[in-house]
Amino acid sequence: MKRPWNRTNSNVYSLMTSCEKASYNMNICTYVSVVNIKPKIYLISIDKSTLTFKNLTNNPVSIVLQSLSIKNIKLVKLLGKKSGFTYNKQRALENRKLTSLWKGHNVLNDCCFLIELHKLKKIHEMHDHCIFTFEIKSFKNFNHNFLTFQCLIENKIIL
């Protein structure tokens, strides 16, 4: 039997963060939770060894939480298993025409929803991850074909 923390079936997300100038990076997030209703506040846990963490710490200008759909499953290895420090994810996504613009932000095509976020603060630093709070600025819904943690297990992408 799986460990309790691997028995969840939460949505799989990608967080788009801005880098220097006009560039951006995207990652894979599964530690994401809404924790307040008014105002709507999200908690997101970010691996401290990633470019996403660096971007959130140094340059939190443009942040979009993207709920991935089943159509995005092939992007999980690119966005989650490759480091933004050593691999240009922006170039790979744009060369394959997998992004579009939403409110001036580069986002993935075929997402279930997009949430434009404003970073409030870093609230808890742990050994390998750090928890950040974000307030919702705007959002857009698209479809209901959510990519879930269980889909990643069934397709042997994780565990």
What residue spans do the PLM features occupy?
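Basic, polyanion-binding surface patches
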Residues: 1-159
